[in-house]
Design a protein with these regions (language model features):
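The feature captures the beta-strand-to-loop junction immediately N-terminal to the Walker
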Residues: 70-72
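Helix-to-loop junction immediately C-terminal to a conserved catalytic motif
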Residues: 85
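Conserved ABC transporter NBD signature motif
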Residues: 93-103
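Short coil-to-helix segment of the ABC ATPase nucleotide-binding domain corresponding to the Q-loop/switch region
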Residues: 124-131
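Conserved ABC ATPase "signature" region
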Residues: 135, 142-160, 212
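Catalytic Walker B motif of ABC-type/P-loop ATPase nucleotide-binding domains
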Residues: 189-192
Length: 288
């Protein structure tokens, strides 16, 4: 329950994706850095000795960007996101979220967190699952109802509010989880492989839905994935990470236009970026 109330972020969709990362249709305000990570390292102490999870991470995320973390298993993608979310503490370096410490940003509910599994309570209806963080935050019944209806509409689940999680497909459950994360209108969304367990057709559909949601809400998004096509399709910026210890190998701008039908994955521009990401992943392994 505490996790559900923790956080959520902002998203956008404008002219070219490169343009969007500088000016997401909101002028100079979008140039604001909302996540600022400087020289961050994290070492876990274990019975077998220290494990260097992250090393010398430097990253700035602008308001309205959609930033994907991609890399092999164990490279620290989720760990880095958890540091931003105040779920892990760095050993050294600094992190600010909206100019605050991660702890203060969490307490201010600056971001919503979407997990790999939908993490819906099976004994609560979809409506009641989405309502949970709002109840904790003290919203009135009328306000809760308005927000539930609004966010169910955003994720195309209107009419499913009285259903239980077990009555929904896996993809619908994840959409309900996203609606819950958006319910208190956070500045940002942190999404940890939310579609990783879904089949390819459902995943494609949810990728399209997420882009539309991003365009509608203009929230900053941090998205963890293992999928190169998914990262290129969704992102304005892709952070390629290498393992042992986790570090940033390369940051790649996605200079694609605002309209991204699934067919864009066959375009020369898309394939060129995908190839660059793949090469970055390969070289990151070689250099380790």
């Amino acid at each position: 329950m505490a996790i559900v109330q923790l956080r959520e972020p902002r998203m956008n969709l404008n002219d070219s994706m490169a343009t969007r990362s500088r000016d997401n249709g909101r002028g100079e305000a979008n140039a604001q850095t909302v996540i600022d990570i400087k020289d961050l390292s994290l070492v876990f102490e274990t019975n077998d000795g220290p494990v260097h999870a992250l090393s010398n991470i430097d990253l700035a995320v602008k308001r309205g960007e959609f930033v994907s973390f991609i890399g092999p298993s164990g490279c620290g993608k989720t760990t880095l996101m958890r540091v931003v979310a105040d779920l892990e503490q760095p050993t050294s370096g600094s992190v600010t979220v909206n100019g605050k410490t991660p702890e203060q940003a969490r307490l201010d509910r600056s971001y919503g967190y979407v997990f790999q599994a939908a993490a819906l309570f099976p004994w609560r209806t979809i409506e009641d699952n989405i309502s949970l963080p709002l109840e904790i935050m003290g919203f009135s019944k009328t306000e809760r109802r308005e927000r539930i209806e609004k966010n169910l509409a955003l994720v195309n689940l209107s009419g499913f509010d009285k259903k239980y999680p077990w009555q929904l497909s896996g993809g619908m459950q994840q959409r309900a989880s996203i609606a819950r994360a958006l319910s208190f209108d956070p500045d940002m969304l942190l999404m940890d492989e939310p579609f990783g367990a879904l089949d390819e057709i459902v995943r494609d559909h949810l990728n399209e839905q997420l882009l539309k949601l991003w365009a509608a809400t203009r929230k900053t998004v941090i998205f963890v994935t293992h999928s190169i096509p998914e990262a290129v399709f969704l992102s304005t910026k892709i952070v390629v990470m290498s393992p042992r210890p986790g570090r940033i190998h390369e940051i790649i701008d996605c200079d694609l236009g605002p309209d991204r039908p699934l067919e864009i994955r066959e375009s020369e521009a898309f394939l060129k970026i995908a190839h660059r990401v793949r090469e970055g992943l390969r070289l990151g392994h070689i250099h380790e």
